């Protein structure tokens, strides 16, 4: 069972109760704390669009603790991050793996962070296929296409040559926060909350 904490604020009109995620959203903070599927992506995209409508000139913070997930769902979040006007600061807490790492790198350059003990993992897209030979061939071509697309974007976001990205994503590649910074997936290691201002 997933218990969602409630916070209570005192206002001039009395008390107001929020679930913790709504309270964080009020401060322009979004938490991606699960595997990425269509439902999670729809929720994150809706929050990004809402915050843009609220104030298109104020930054948004996206905290990431995710094992990754669906490529298409992750790309929905990525594309939205790129088209909205507010800058999206990304912060890795715990682990940003696979599509989680991709979204971490997709943050506004100069505003991509990891906590000191966070880990980042990159790898090539995963996929399975079954059925007739032609269906398996179609699925394999799609995975290869997605790998090229994701590697190209990671190369742009990190400054690493495409060949290096292709080599380093061939297998699970785990990185400390320090290594992720050297690699270009993040810009800073956050030591105090004032670092993200």
UniProtKB/Swiss-Prot annotation:
Cellular location(s): Cytoplasm
Active site positions, chain numbering: 98, 123
Lineage: Bacteria, Bacillati, Bacillota, Bacilli, Bacillales
Gene Ontology BP terms: protein quality control for misfolded or incompletely synthesized proteins
Gene Ontology cellular-component terms listed: cytoplasm; endopeptidase Clp complex
Species for this entry: Lysinibacillus sphaericus (strain C3-41)
Name of the protein: ATP-dependent Clp protease proteolytic subunit
Role played: Cleaves peptides in various proteins in a process that requires ATP hydrolysis. Has a chymotrypsin-like activity. Plays a major role in the degradation of misfolded proteins.
Keyword Hydrolase: yes
């Amino acid at each position: 069972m997933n218990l969602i904490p409630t916070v209570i604020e005192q206002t001039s009109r009395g008390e107001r109760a929020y679930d913790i995620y709504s309270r964080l959203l009020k401060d322009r903070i979004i938490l991606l704390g699960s595997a990425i599927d269509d439902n999670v992506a729809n929720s994150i995209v809706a929050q990004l669009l809402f915050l843009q409508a609220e104030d298109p000139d104020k930054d948004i913070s996206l905290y990431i603790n995710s094992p990754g997930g669906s490529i298409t769902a992750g790309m929905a979040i990525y594309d939205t991050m790129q088209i909205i006007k507010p800058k999206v600061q990304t912060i890795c807490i715990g682990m940003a793996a696979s599509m989680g790492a991709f979204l971490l790198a997709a943050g506004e350059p100069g505003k991509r962070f990891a906590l000191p003990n966070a880990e980042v993992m990159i790898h090539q897209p995963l996929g399975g296929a079954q059925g007739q030979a032609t269906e398996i061939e179609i699925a394999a071509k799609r995975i290869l296409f997605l790998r090229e697309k994701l590697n190209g974007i990671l190369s742009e976001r990190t400054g690493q040559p495409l060949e290096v990205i292709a080599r380093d994503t061939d297998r699970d590649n785990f990185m400390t926060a320090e290594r992720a910074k050297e690699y270009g997936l993040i810009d800073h290691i956050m030591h105090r909350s004032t670092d993200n201002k």
